[in-house]
Amino acid sequence: MASSEIDRSEAFQQLTGFPIGRWQRRLLDMLLSGEPPPGVALPTGIGKTSVMTLWLIARGFGAALPRRLVYVVDRRVVVDQASREAEALKNKLAPAVQDPLLRALRQGLGLGAEAELPVSSLRGGLADDAAWRLDPAASAIIVGTVDMIGSRLLFEGYGVSRRMRPLQAGLLGCDALVVLDEAHLVPPFAALMRSIVADASPRGSGGDGMPPGLRLMTLSATGREASDARIFRLEPEEAKEKL
């Protein structure tokens, strides 16, 4: 689906109720190129969870991005907040939506006439509603805690039967973009994720018969990785922008 900058900005406004910011526009351009940065260093309170919306728009407009976004954070309260945002995106893209741009986004995401965007939360105290694993070909958003996502990636999912563990590990480890929020609080898990991504690097893009691999994008407010030129961080003019 071809898009213009106006279309992308309008899509963001419709999905979130807010105009797109400069840094969000720049990050969206990177996602549209199919090359998300390995890390994003942004100050607290700037709206880092909007990366879910940016991924959704980029995929809807045809970007070569993983079909599953796995948003991981170690605090339940943030998991619940991110889950609410994901559910809001799901509702905005409901089958009954009439807006032409949002309908085009649905089509770009591969959602059938009656299909909803699969959104699932994986954290302690909540039952897995299974929406994310019913159709491996569907675009989906999974939000979960470090222990719930990590254990599944390592074939040891909490409360998951032995028969289902390979399926869940495969869905989270292939054709998935893991967004690790507050990565500075869980350095061992961040290191584990980088190791898993490195081990999976021989995987292809899907066109060579190999399943697309796992990709990682960390979110952090500390800027510990700022020495890495590939890390996305605010430019001076973006830092001055009113939130």
Predicted feature residues:
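N-terminal helicase ATP-binding lobe
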Residues: 1-243
